[in-house]
């Protein structure tokens, strides 16, 4: 099994859970000492370009590893899943991830809120703010969120 990254706590948990079940796990990383490296269940860290700095190089390195015959499966753990979907036409090895349209629908806070509305699932009241006039009638305090952000970045309480 090859993990798409090795620096997150998510990757560390995957390594532990899979390793305890006897799965041989390697992980890709652009840094020398990612957290997964310190698990007894991680056999190797495969150095690859950083997907944020060289997405094409990262896809090419992933494709080389997956077509080497050494791995039965690739497990995307974070944003790399989106990159594999967007770049699937550049890879010989097929990575089983959702189509890019599905990612766009759930990764955009606006599109996700619309999806919840379409499905009639409960969520806090929300409004798209594009112009200053869109602010009228808001009950403060409010939270403003960037359409795309992660881990609390792009969030402002006013």
Language-model segments: which ranges?
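ATP-binding N-terminal substructure of ATP-dependent carboxylate-amine bond-forming enzymes
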Residues: 1-99
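Active-site nucleotide/adenylate-binding loops and adjacent lid/helix of ATP-dependent enzymes
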Residues: 103-158
């Amino acid at each position: 099994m090859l993990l798409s990254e090795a620096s997150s706590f998510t990757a560390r948990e995957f390594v532990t859970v899979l390793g305890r079940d006897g799965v041989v796990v390697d992980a890709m990383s652009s840094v020398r000492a990612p957290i997964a490296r310190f698990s007894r269940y991680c056999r190797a860290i495969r150095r690859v370009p950083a997907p944020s700095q060289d997405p094409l190089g990262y896809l090419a390195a992933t494709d080389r590893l997956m077509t080497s015959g050494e791995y039965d499966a690739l497990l995307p753990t974070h944003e790399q899943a989106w990159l594999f979907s967007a770049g699937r036409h550049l890879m010989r090895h097929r990575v089983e991830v959702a189509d890019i349209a599905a990612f766009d629908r759930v990764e955009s806070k606006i599109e996700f809120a619309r999806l919840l509305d379409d499905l009639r699932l409960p969520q806090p009241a929300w409004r798209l703010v594009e112009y200053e006039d869109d602010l009228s009638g808001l009950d403060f305090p409010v939270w403003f969120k960037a359409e795309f952000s992660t881990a609390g970045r792009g969030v402002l309480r006013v």
